[in-house]
């Protein structure tokens, strides 16, 4: 019987779901972070996700999550317990993240940022410093030096920036980030102007901040892009050494396997 792990990146907007084996993440899905649903409705949807990936609910041997939405955690615990007969393991509450946390108030750091930083260090141990750039609800730059999480930078996310712009602008076209060109085009429509402005604007912001971070972090430094918009931004930027949209899910998988805890 196959053995797989069910991994959850519980964010403010979406829950990213990963199905992984001992070698890596084999499938990923996205559901909305709906705190008004029941544990049963969530559990049934998760069971369908597992079946869609070609597995049975009984194949799930562990459920592991990072969460920045505390009100969602009881729903996920109920769903995992009832539909997979597994307790939900939360990082860092149930599984410690083996990085020295140098934040002034360590409890303020989101679990997602710590897990992504941990994953970056485990996957690329060679560089002295590594920066994980996560394009999520916010765009975060998380800095690891040696085995220490130093902190980072937080900027607006692509969706949140687009939402703020739409809130103050009438008849704003939808931003798709569908840009095929390698250089920005002088837009001759509002849609093109927005898409090129966002893609190349966020790419330039990333390049500028990473250049400045390289002056304060110990060399050599590498940069990894992750999150939903990582591929779109990385296509037009040469500042990334690695692109791993599922970095956080991979971090949860490695964290669980290293912990020795049984689900």
From Swiss-Prot:
Is Cytoplasm there in the keyword field?
yes
GO BP annotations of the record are: coenzyme A biosynthetic process
Q: Which reaction does it catalyse?
A: (R)-pantothenate + ATP = (R)-4'-phosphopantothenate + ADP + H(+)
Q: Does the keyword Nucleotide-binding apply?
A: yes
Which residues are noted in the entry as substrate-binding? 103, 110-113, 190
Q: Which GO terms describe its molecular function?
A: ATP binding; metal ion binding; pantothenate kinase activity
Cofactors (names)? NH4(+); K(+)
EC number(s) for this protein? 2.7.1.33
List the InterPro entries.
ATPase_NBD (IPR043129), Type_III_PanK (IPR004619)
Cofactor descriptive note: A monovalent cation. Ammonium or potassium.
Give the positions the UniProt entry annotates as the active site. 112 (proton acceptor)
Q: Which residues bind ATP?
A: 9-16, 137
User: What pathway is it annotated to?
Assistant: Cofactor biosynthesis; coenzyme A biosynthesis; CoA from (R)-pantothenate: step 1/5
Listed Pfam families: Pan_kinase
Where, per UniProt, does this protein localize? Cytoplasm
What UniProt keywords are attached to this protein's entry? ATP-binding, Coenzyme A biosynthesis, Cytoplasm, Kinase, Metal-binding, Nucleotide-binding, Potassium, Transferase
Listed GO CC annotations: cytoplasm
Where is K(+) bound in this sequence? 134
Similarity field: Belongs to the type III pantothenate kinase family.
- What subunit structure does UniProt give? Homodimer.
Q: Which NCBIfam families match?
A: baf, PRK13321.1
Query: What job does the chain carry out?
Result: Catalyzes the phosphorylation of pantothenate (Pan), the first step in CoA biosynthesis.
Record protein name field: Type III pantothenate kinase
The gene is: coaX
């Amino acid at each position: 019987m196959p053995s797989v792990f069910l991994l959850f990146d519980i964010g403010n907007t979406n829950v990213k779901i990963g199905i992984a084996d001992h070698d890596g993440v084999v499938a990923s899905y996205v559901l909305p972070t709906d705190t008004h649903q029941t544990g049963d409705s969530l559990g049934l949807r998760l069971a369908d996700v597992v079946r869609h990936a070609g597995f049975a609910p009984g194949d799930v041997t562990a459920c592991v999550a990072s969460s920045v939405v505390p009100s969602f955690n009881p729903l996920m615990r109920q769903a995992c317990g009832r539909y997979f007969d597994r307790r939900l393991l939360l990082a860092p509450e149930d599984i410690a993240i083996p990085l020295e946390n140098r934040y002034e108030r360590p409890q303020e750091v989101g679990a997602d940022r710590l897990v992504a930083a941990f994953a970056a260090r485990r996957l690329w141990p060679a560089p002295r410093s590594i920066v994980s750039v996560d394009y999520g609800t916010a765009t975060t730059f998380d800095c690891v030096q040696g085995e220490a999480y130093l902190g980072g930078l937080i900027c607006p996310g692509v969706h949140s920036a687009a939402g703020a712009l739409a809130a103050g602008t009438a008849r704003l076209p939808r931003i798709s980030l569908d840009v095929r060109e390698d250089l920005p085009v002088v837009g001759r429509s509002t849609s093109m102007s927005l898409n090129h402005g966002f893609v190349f604007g966020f790419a330039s912001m990333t390049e500028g901040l990473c250049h400045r971070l390289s002056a304060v972090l110990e060399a050599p430094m590498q940069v990894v892009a992750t999150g939903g918009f990582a591929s779109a931004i990385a296509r037009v930027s040469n500042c990334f050494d690695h692109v791993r949209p599922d970095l956080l899910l991979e971090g949860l998988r490695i964290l669980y396997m290293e912990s020795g805890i049984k689900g």
